[in-house]
């Protein structure tokens, strides 16, 4: 099974924080911390179901693996 890569980034005209998984977009968070918390929770749930998961933070042109 492929790795589930949750990406936390800003999106839209208002630059709201969102979590993406492939082409799916989840949430419109007011801050980065809330988006990261939800992404890490989702990744942990995936790992508990036997999947491999990662969380990446994309801010401007820099990406960092968080989990």
Show where each model-derived region lies.
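Charged, amphipathic alpha-helical segments
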Residues: 1-3, 33-41
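A short, exposed loop/beta-hairpin motif centered on an aromatic-Gly-Thr core
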Residues: 21-36
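Low-complexity, intrinsically disordered/propeptide-like segments
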Residues: 24, 39-40, 60
């Amino acid at each position: 099974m492929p790795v589930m890569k949750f990406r936390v980034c800003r999106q839209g005209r208002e630059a709201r924080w969102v979590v993406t998984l492939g082409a799916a977009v989840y949430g419109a968070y007011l801050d980065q911390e809330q988006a990261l918390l939800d992404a890490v929770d989702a990744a942990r749930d995936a790992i508990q179901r036997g999947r491999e998961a990662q969380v990446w933070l994309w801010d401007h042109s820099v990406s960092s693996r968080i989990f």
